[in-house]
């Protein structure tokens, strides 16, 4: 349920308007004048809220809901209580998201925490920095020499933008973020606490001198429409650039090593670790806590299951998982084989199939 203390309350809409906006069918047209003032889950919704249902696991919540209306697929339509107006949709969650975006556009992109519309008095702006019109700088942010920031961008409180950084238009840099040696496109959303463009992890062993640092003289290039979750770190390249492709969405606490290239429209879930000089194609999806070794290539459209460890190249459209990762069908077959061994015991030598026997494990 939307909390008005943090998000603006939307203007009321009628069910007829919602049906027209989403393409859903209002089953009982006589209910078209019912007003909806907000969105909520089935278990929290009230008579003036819209909910959705597309998973049988929540059938109990649907039966008990007090929602005024519910977006539902045709196969679940008969399960909706009589007091709830039915909006029939082939994709109820997609329709719900569409309405949520209309109702709560302010939640899609963080704005100034202080309702600033310009540069705060306590922000530090180097004289050589260039800010286009309508740039907002929150208190205590620091903008370094020769920085350029495009129109409509918002820099959060305590953020530090290093020398020469370029930030495009309609971007948002969250509070406490640091950015150096980086070029950023338009419509990029960087959540609080990110660190972008710092040294990559590069050392070489020089005998008695120990591990000697390798200069990291590349950049980070972040293309248009990228979103980067809170606490994520992206190292700049050593000789070539670290690149984040257009439309890629990165979750919280992801580590991206130097020289990594990530393609367009990729999805990276939380706590992924990408070693250096890795190349990831377009439309790749990586589950949470995936680790990928350096100098590998992940093909277009590949998917990797959460908590997998990848040490080999993955072909385009590959579905891999496990530790170490392999094609998912092979991984599942091996898991089943291990389960059978644990359950039945290994066959005796020379016997095609030994009878199960009791074992004592100490």
Swiss-Prot record:
Transmembrane segments: none annotated. This is UDP-3-O-acylglucosamine N-acyltransferase 1. Keywords: Acyltransferase, Lipid A biosynthesis, Lipid biosynthesis, Lipid metabolism, Repeat, Transferase. The active site is at 258 (proton acceptor). Pathway: Bacterial outer membrane biogenesis; LPS lipid A biosynthesis. Belongs to the transferase hexapeptide repeat family. LpxD subfamily. It comes from Nitrobacter winogradskyi (strain ATCC 25391 / DSM 10237 / CIP 104748 / NCIMB 11846 / Nb-255). CDD domains: LbH_LpxD. GO terms for molecular function: N-acyltransferase activity. One of its GO terms (biological process) is lipid A biosynthetic process. GO terms for cellular component: membrane. PANTHER family: UDP-3-O-ACYLGLUCOSAMINE N-ACYLTRANSFERASE, UDP-3-O-ACYLGLUCOSAMINE N-ACYLTRANSFERASE 1, MITOCHONDRIAL-RELATED. The gene is lpxD1. It catalyses: a UDP-3-O-[(3R)-3-hydroxyacyl]-alpha-D-glucosamine + a (3R)-hydroxyacyl-[ACP] = a UDP-2-N,3-O-bis[(3R)-3-hydroxyacyl]-alpha-D-glucosamine + holo-[ACP] + H(+). Homotrimer. NCBIfam families: lipid_A_lpxD, PRK00892.1. Its EC number is 2.3.1.191. Catalyzes the N-acylation of UDP-3-O-acylglucosamine using 3-hydroxyacyl-ACP as the acyl donor. Is involved in the biosynthesis of lipid A, a phosphorylated glycolipid that anchors the lipopolysaccharide to the outer membrane of the cell. Pfam families: Hexapep (PF00132), Hexapep_2 (PF14602), LpxD (PF04613).
């Amino acid at each position: 349920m939307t909390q008005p203390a943090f998000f603006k309350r939307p203007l009321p809409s009628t069910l007829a308007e919602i049906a027209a906006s989403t393409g859903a069918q209002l089953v009982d047209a006589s209910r078209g004048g019912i007003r909806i003032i907000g969105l909520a889950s089935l278990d929290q919704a009230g008579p003036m809220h819209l909910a959705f249902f597309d998973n049988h696991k929540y059938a109990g919540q649907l039966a008990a809901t007090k929602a005024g209306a519910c977006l539902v697929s045709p196969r679940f339509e008969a399960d909706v209580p009589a007091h709830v107006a039915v909006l029939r949709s082939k994709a109820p969650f997609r329709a719900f998201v569409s309405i949520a975006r209309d109702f709560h556009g302010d939640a899609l992109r963080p704005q100034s925490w202080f309702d600033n519309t310009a540069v705060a008095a306590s922000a530090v702006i180097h004289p050589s920095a260039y800010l286009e019109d309508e740039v907002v700088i929150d208190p205590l942010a620091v903008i370094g020499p020769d920085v350029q920031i495009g129109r409509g961008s918002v820099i959060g409180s305590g953020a530090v933008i290093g020398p020469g950084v370029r930030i495009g238009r309609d971007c948002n840099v969250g509070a406490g973020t640091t950015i150096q040696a980086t070029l950023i496109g338009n419509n990029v959303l960087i959540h609080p606490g990110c660190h972008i463009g710092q040294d990559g992890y590069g050392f070489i062993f020089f005998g008695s001198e120990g591990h000697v640092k390798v200069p990291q003289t590349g950049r980070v290039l972040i293309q248009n429409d990228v979103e980067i979750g809170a606490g994520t770190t992206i190292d700049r390249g050593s000789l070539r650039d670290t690149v984040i492709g257009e439309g890629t969405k990165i979750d919280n606490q992801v580590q991206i090593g130097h020289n990594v290239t990530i393609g367009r429209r990729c999805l990276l879930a939380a706590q992924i670790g990408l070693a250096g000089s890795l190349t990831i194609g377009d439309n790749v999806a990586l589950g949470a806590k995936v680790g990928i070794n350096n100098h590998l290539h992940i093909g277009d459209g590949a998917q990797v299951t959460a908590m997998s460890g990848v040490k080999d190249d993955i072909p385009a459209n590959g579905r891999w998982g496990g530790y170490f990762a392999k094609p998912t069908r092979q991984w599942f077959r091996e898991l089943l084989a291990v389960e059978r061994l644990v359950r039945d015991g290994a066959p005796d030598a020379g016997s095609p199939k030994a009878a199960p026997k009791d074992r004592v494990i100490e």
